[in-house]
């Protein structure tokens, strides 16, 4: 009886565990798991196809092949359950045990586990202090190792060859010492290790040693020893006596048709191990010669190696078709391994896919689902309903009925589908908006209909894209789909908080057309009392859609147009008429939807979006816009411009021929001229295409007026519907400069445009760019996907998990200014953040925002009006939450427009927001057809505001003609208004001519400074006579005759002589060195390699004149290609190729004696006004680099002293975490800004926080850390608090910046790390440490098949029960509301009467 009860017992819940531990398996453990030993390599009998006894598929060990049936057929069926057949020894039980029962192989000699032998650093070698090479010699039976030296002079662990051993035996006698070879010897040595003692000795050695290399070596060994000590693993378990055999159904043998068998590679690998093991056993029994046994042992070791990790050592074992066999490690590794193929990505049932087409009359929350698809997807629900309604009595008859597609079935399908959302997904799903929920509407045909407004989120178009449909089954799933994933709940983009549901293309065109005004249109100037009158007049054809009229709206007379009044009918009243009383292009429409969302909430916005969609399509159709050839107006002045440019270019060629400029400068100037002319032609063309004159009658008189053009091409670009000024330029202006495949710009531009047609040569030049674009796209898509994967992996466990961490720390944030221009105003950067302290008005002192209040739109306005320049806010970077992040530090959830909720997976959102545009950008390179777009190099400064000039830190020299020249590189020109408030500040480049005086009043647009953008000059501060020093023809300087010009140029070259320091000195008439006025040092100027000397020996020179100039490199086009790798480089925290040295301290620059081809730069700090040479820092900079500081300059800590990007690790060391974070955020933003992509700073901050999670221990104090160990910050702080509370010494650490790959691999969770990269390495490390994974991140829970600990899967919601009410047949209120508003619509859903916003209820 008891058996029966057990049979119906619920199986244990496989998910009821909280953590997973991984450790080494001891031989006893393996035997304990095993159900029997596999002794024979046979698999199945070729005649009966039954498994061989004791073979790899043996039924006695692994269980029966058929359910409840023993192998010989004596016992069959359930009644014999649990009996063991006395004939064939098979237990009568379900056959599925063959998926879980293990066997084992007892080895004749211990072998090393290859992971612990070869996975660097070798753990076995580390513990025994033997190099990997020597260890392999022992294991693969090539030399002997001394186990016990006894009285001989040998060392324990020393390797000796066979000859030497025999010699020693002769000297000292047979049993004077013990040696061993192969696995037994290594196992002996591991067994004799005392880990406790080893640990203590190593700690002592580390304290006593002085050599850094030794300390590192001890630390490495100590790490492994500690791991064994703490985890309870025994070192000898790294050697295997017993090998587990995995269940046969996991390495199946499948009969193919034609009598052949397909088998898993593991069976082959196991067979080799068993064969060799059996042979070794036999040889040992026969007492075979040592050399044969040794060879067999080596072969056994190799066979076991291949089974665990084929190809890791020696030759890869291949199958009959020369394909490497897949070992146990390969089953886990890589994209096709267990982790990524089956655990992180699974196929989903109840899903279908089809091509998508546009559904212009769908509502925003709907999608069109083909009937045949719906019938298949909702089958179980239909069967249930058919039975419930009494159409059928059994599931079988329901099936038949559905197959026949009887009319009742369709009625029931309608019923089933109502209010049952489905998920639509378009691959690649780059961010969470790539999967959204919709309510299905049944349609005929086979294509899914998609709402046009959600295309932007899915990045879908209708050129053959396919989408997948998934059905959420449970009530909870349907609820989540409706509440969280419904398209109507995803109006804002999580990346930047701006609406993502904005009209595009035709819709924009239609709305733009209807809000434009046309001069002399029918009914112009009429006055109406209400919008209803305008509608009536328009319906009766009395007024033109674009006529300018006056209408009373909300009690005020408004000058407007008919079209705008008609648009007003569909806009919520709260938005106000002024928001739409203008020409609405794409940007304004986005603004309108944003405004509507902020003022009236989600529901109204959805209704507005749908109505704007209908109006847009309707009016775009009515407008009848088309393109004709003559719409591409070629500017009349084009030829004139081209002639002028050619003249300029030939002048520059002449200058080059006369030797006034170098070839590089000539190239740069030519490119600049053409870039400028292309711009001019484009401007001229835009002017002609964008304005038109029109004549008409007004009060009986003919008159002519100018108005914005109705040229269709212009309309499309101006409205933002399609195309850009740049594309129009190529159609009707000139194509302009093109780039070579290498990225350089070809200096002859394409002067033709597409309307005129290109010549063969021009066409050929333009194919370069196009092809490069396509090739780039293919490569970059992969790169971008990989970047996203790394970002997700590093940030997956950043979850909002507490409300307030209580930190007192935050960041100062100001407007982002570059080149005097405000790129991002303060308001945009602080919107949605939380204030750290009270923010006070600087003038009145009133509180604008209280501490811990969210800075919303209203407060941003107040802060901006108060004129503050920076605000202290809370940030993810300074959040003190241990794991995860707190609500207050994160601030606003961008996709919802309110504070973030606990449980939001902000890390993944951040990763998607950064990764998604990466892919977008990569896919959008080729749209401009490779045309090189370079803005003419900036070479001057103009002010934008009136005010007076102040110089800040600017050192100048007056030239003989009275102009000032800037002599330092960190000077700035500041413009202040009358009250002394700073309006703008500009950095002045070294060597610039300054054209304004200090204190001068200037109007806007005055030229304040100008410089040569193509060369960096070296100027003299004093006048005198030039003398060359160490400038020797052919050694440090080459004088090259320019063939073209016949003139010579002196260029400084790298000298073979390390002592040579080419320099120019300035002397007085008597030949004495002059002193520099700023630093009292002698006036000698060192010339960097590659500089061109412009003065001759013995010339007289005046202050501010150029001694030499360094040409800037030829400019390449900026393209996100520079972008993606740059972003990856920043997130990986790599040292840039030519990293700029940055100053570690504040001080004064001087140059020392050069060494080995490097220049010595010295920074001397000043203490109380005097220079302390004892504290000076020295830097060696290779001669080829261009140093941007000059002798006597003052530098601040963290300032770059040469061209190039800074190394983030240096910034962290010198300036600390906040500055580093600011640098990373700004640099990443810079790349995206170039592409016009908006990402909120907090996303990048979230990733940077994950990169800065760890500390490197520099001094261990009395803690258990090791020197140079990397630990999580909070672990470090906790340990220190504990130690200090006991009155001991705390550890000291320095913050550590890890690249995203490194950070992912060093997470707490080994499951997450091993599924990311380097699977074997991570698992080896984890096993030795006996690591426990507490399943805190998202990834490890997905792998274990549990709910993720975020969102609705938070532990606190685990025991919530959902009460399900029976559904009532109420009509969706929103439907009703919309039916009311769209009552009788005109064609294409244009409302034909005024529509208020009298909608009620909520969906």
From Swiss-Prot:
It catalyses: RNA(n) + a ribonucleoside 5'-triphosphate = RNA(n+1) + diphosphate. Binds 1 Mg(2+) ion per subunit. SUPFAM superfamilies: beta and beta-prime subunits of DNA dependent RNA-polymerase (SSF64484). Keywords: DNA-directed RNA polymerase, Magnesium, Metal-binding, Nucleotidyltransferase, Transcription, Transferase, Zinc. GO terms for biological process: DNA-templated transcription. InterPro entries: DNA-dir_RpoC_beta_prime, DNA-dir_RpoC_beta_prime_bact, RNA_pol_asu, RNA_pol_N, RNA_pol_Rpb1_1, RNA_pol_Rpb1_3, RNA_pol_Rpb1_3_sf, RNA_pol_Rpb1_4. Zn(2+) 1 binds at residues 70, 72, 85, 88. Mg(2+) binds at residues 461, 463, 465. Its EC number is 2.7.7.6. GO terms for cellular component: DNA-directed RNA polymerase complex. Zn(2+) 2 binds at residues 805, 879, 886, 889. Pfam families: RNA_pol_Rpb1_1, RNA_pol_Rpb1_2, RNA_pol_Rpb1_3, RNA_pol_Rpb1_4, RNA_pol_Rpb1_5. The keyword Metal-binding applies. Belongs to the RNA polymerase beta' chain family. The RNAP catalytic core consists of 2 alpha, 1 beta, 1 beta' and 1 omega subunit. When a sigma factor is associated with the core the holoenzyme is formed, which can initiate transcription. HAMAP family: RNApol_bact_RpoC (MF_01322). NCBIfam families: rpoC_TIGR. This is DNA-directed RNA polymerase subunit beta'. It comes from Myxococcus xanthus (strain DK1622).
């Amino acid at each position: 009886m008891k058996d029966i009860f057990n049979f119906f017992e619920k199986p244990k819940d496989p998910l009821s565990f909280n953590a997973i531990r991984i450790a080494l398996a001891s031989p006893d453990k393996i035997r304990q798991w095993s159900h029997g030993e596999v002794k024979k390599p046979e698999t199945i009998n070729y005649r009966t196809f039954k498994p061989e006894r004791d073979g790899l598929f043996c039924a006695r060990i692994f269980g029966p092949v058929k359910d409840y049936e023993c192998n010989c057929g004596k016992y069959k069926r359930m009644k014999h359950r649990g009996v063991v057949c006395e004939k064939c020894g098979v237990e009568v039980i379900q056959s599925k045990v063959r998926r879980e029962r293990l066997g084992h192989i007892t080895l004749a000699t211990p072998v090393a586990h290859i992971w612990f032998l070869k996975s660097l650093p070798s753990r076995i070698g580390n513990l025994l202090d033997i190099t990997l090479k020597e260890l392999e010699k022992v294991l693969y039976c090539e030399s002997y190792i001394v186990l016990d030296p006894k009285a001989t002079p040998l060392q324990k662990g020393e390797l000796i060859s066979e000859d030497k051993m025999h010699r020693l035996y002769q000297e000292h006698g047979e049993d004077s010492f013990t040696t061993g070879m192969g696995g037994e010897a290594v196992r002996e040595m591991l067994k004799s290790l005392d880990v406790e003692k080893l640990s203590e000795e190593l700690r002592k050695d580390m304290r006593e040693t002085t050599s850094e290399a030794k300390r590192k070596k001890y630390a490495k060994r100590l790490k492994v020893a500690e791991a064994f000590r703490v985890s309870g693993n025994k070192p000898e378990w790294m050697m295997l006596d017993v090998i587990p055999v995995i269940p046969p159904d996991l390495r199946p043998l499948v009969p193919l048709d034609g009598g052949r068998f397909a088998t898993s590679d593991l069976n082959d690998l196991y067979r080799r191990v068993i064969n060799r093991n059996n042979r070794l056993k036999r040889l040992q029994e026969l007492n075979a010669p040592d050399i044969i046994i040794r060879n067999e042992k080596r072969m056994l070791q190799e066979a076991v190696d291949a089974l665990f990790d084929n190809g890791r050592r020696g030759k890869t074992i291949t199958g009959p078709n020369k394909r490497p066999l897949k070992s146990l490690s390969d089953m886990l590794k890589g994209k096709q391994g267990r982790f990524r193929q089956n655990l992180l990505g699974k196929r989903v049932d109840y899903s279908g896919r089809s091509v998508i087409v546009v559904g212009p009359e769908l509502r925003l929350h709907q999608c069109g689902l083909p009937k045949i698809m719906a019938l298949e997807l909702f089958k179980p629900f239909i069967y249930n309903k058919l039975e419930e309604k009494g159409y059928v009595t059994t599931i079988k008859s329901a099936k038949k009925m559905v197959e026949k597609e009887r009319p009742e079935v369709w009625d029931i399908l309608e019923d089933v589908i109502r209010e049952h959302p489905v998920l639509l997904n378009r691959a690649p799903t780059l961010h969470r908006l790539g999967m959204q929920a919709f309510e299905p509407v049944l349609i005929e045909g086979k294509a899914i209909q998609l709402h046009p407004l959600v295309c932007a989120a899915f990045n879908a178009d209708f050129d053959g894209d396919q989408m997948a449909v998934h059905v959420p089954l449970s009530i909870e799933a349907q609820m989540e789909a409706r509440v969280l994933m419904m398209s109507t709940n995803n109006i804002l983009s999580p990346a930047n908080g701006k609406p993502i549901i904005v009209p595009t293309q035709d819709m924009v065109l239609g709305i733009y057309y209807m809000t434009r005004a046309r001069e002399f249109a029918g009914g112009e100037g009429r006055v109406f009392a209400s919008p209803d009158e305008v509608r009536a007049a328009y319906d009766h054809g009395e007024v033109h859609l674009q006529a300018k009229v006056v209408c009373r709206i909300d009690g005020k007379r408004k000058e407007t147009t008919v079209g705008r009044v008609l648009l007003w009918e569909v806009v919520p009243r709260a938005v106000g008429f002024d928001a739409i009383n203008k020409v609405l292009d794409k940007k304004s429409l986005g603004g309108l939807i944003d405004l509507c969302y902020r003022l009236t909430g989600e529901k109204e916005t959805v209704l507005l979006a749908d109505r704007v969609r209908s109006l847009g399509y309707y009016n775009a159709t009515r407008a009848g816009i088309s393109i004709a050839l003559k719409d591409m107006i070629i500017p009349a002045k084009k030829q004139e411009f081209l002639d002028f440019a050619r003249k300029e270019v030939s002048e520059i060629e002449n200058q080059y021929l006369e030797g006034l400029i170098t070839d590089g400068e000539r190239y740069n100037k030519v490119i600049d001229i053409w870039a400028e002319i292309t711009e001019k032609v484009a401007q001229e063309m835009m002017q002609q295409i964008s304005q038109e004159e029109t004549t008409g009658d007004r009060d009986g008189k003919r008159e002519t007026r100018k108005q914005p053009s109705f040229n269709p091409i212009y309309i499309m670009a101006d409205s933002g519907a399609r195309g850009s000024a740049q594309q129009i330029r190529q159609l009707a202006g000139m194509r302009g400069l093109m780039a070579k495949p290498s990225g350089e710009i070809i200096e002859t531009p394409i002067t033709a445009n597409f309307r005129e047609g290109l010549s063969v040569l021009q066409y050929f030049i333009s194919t370069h760019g196009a092809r490069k674009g396509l090739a780039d796209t293919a490569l970059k898509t992969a790169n971008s996907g990989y970047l996203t994967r790394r970002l997700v992996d590093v940030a997956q466990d950043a979850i909002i998990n507490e409300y307030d961490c209580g930190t007192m720390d935050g960041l100062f944030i100001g407007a982002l200014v570059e080149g005097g221009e405000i790129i991002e105003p303060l308001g945009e950067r602080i919107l949605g953040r939380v204030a750290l302290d009270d923010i006070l008005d600087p003038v009145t002192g009133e509180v604008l925002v209280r501490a811990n209040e969210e800075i919303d739109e209203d407060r941003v306005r107040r802060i901006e009006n108060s004129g503050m320049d920076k605000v202290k806010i809370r940030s993810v970077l300074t959040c003190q939450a241990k794991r995860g992040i707190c609500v207050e530090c994160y601030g606003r959830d961008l996709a919802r427009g309110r504070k973030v909720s606990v449980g939001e997976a902000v890390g993944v959102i951040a990763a998607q927001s950064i990764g998604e545009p990466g892919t977008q950008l990569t896919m959008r390179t080729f749209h401009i057809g490779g045309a090189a777009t370079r803005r003419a190099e900036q070479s001057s400064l103009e002010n934008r505001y009136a005010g007076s000039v102040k110089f800040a830190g600017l050192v100048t020299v007056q030239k003989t003609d009275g102009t000032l020249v800037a002599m330092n590189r960190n000077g700035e020109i500041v413009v202040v208004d009358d009250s002394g408030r700073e309006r703008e500040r500009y950095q002045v480049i070294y060597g610039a001519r300054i054209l304004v005086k200090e204190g001068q009043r200037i109007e806007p647009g005055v030229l304040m400074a100008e410089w040569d953008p193509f060369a960096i000059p070296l100027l003299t501060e004093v006048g005198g006579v030039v003398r060359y020093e160490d400038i020797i023809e052919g050694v440090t300087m080459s004088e090259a005759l320019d063939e073209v010009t016949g003139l010579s140029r002196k260029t400084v070259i790298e000298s073979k002589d390390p002592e040579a320091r080419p320099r120019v000195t300035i002397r007085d008439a008597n030949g004495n060195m002059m002193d520099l006025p700023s630093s009292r040092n002698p006036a000698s100027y060192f010339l960097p390699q590659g500089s061109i000397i412009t003065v001759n020996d013995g010339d007289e020179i005046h202050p501010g004149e150029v001694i030499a100039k360094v040409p800037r490199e030829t400019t390449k086009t900026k393209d996100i290609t520079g972008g993606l790798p740059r972003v990856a480089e920043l997130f990986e925290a790599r040292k840039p190729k030519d990293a700029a040295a940055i100053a570690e301290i504040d001080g004064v620059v001087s140059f020392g004696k050069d060494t080995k081809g490097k220049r010595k730069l010295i920074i001397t700090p000043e203490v109380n006004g005097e220079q302390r040479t004892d504290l000076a820092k020295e830097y060696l900079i290779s001669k080829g680099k261009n140093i941007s500081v000059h002798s006597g300059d003052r530098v601040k800590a963290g300032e770059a002293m040469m061209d190039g990007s800074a190394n983030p690790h240096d910034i962290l060391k010198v300036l600390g975490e906040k500055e580093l974070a600011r640098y990373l955020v700004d640099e990443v933003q810079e790349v995206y800004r170039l592409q016009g992509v908006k990402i909120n700073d907090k996303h990048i901050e979230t990733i940077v926080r994950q990169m800065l999670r760890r500390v490197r221990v520099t001094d261990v104090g009395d803690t258990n850390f090791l020197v140079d160990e990397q630990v999580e910050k909070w672990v470090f702080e906790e340990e220190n608090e504990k130690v200090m509370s006991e009155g001991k010494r705390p550890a000291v650490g320095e913050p550590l910046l890890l690249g995203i790959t490194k950070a992912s691999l060093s997470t707490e969770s080994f499951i997450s790390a091993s599924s990311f990269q380097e699977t074997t390495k991570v698992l080896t490390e984890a096993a030795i440490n006996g690591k426990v994974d507490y399943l805190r991140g998202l990834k490890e829970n997905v792998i274990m098949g549990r709910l993720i600990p975020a969102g609705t899967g938070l532990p606190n919601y685990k025991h919530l029960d959902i009460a399900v009410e029976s559904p009532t047949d109420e009509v969706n209120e929103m439907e009703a509301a919309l039916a009311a508003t769209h009552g009788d619509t005109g064609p294409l859903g244009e409302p034909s009467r005024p529509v208020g916003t009298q909608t009620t209820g909520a969906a």
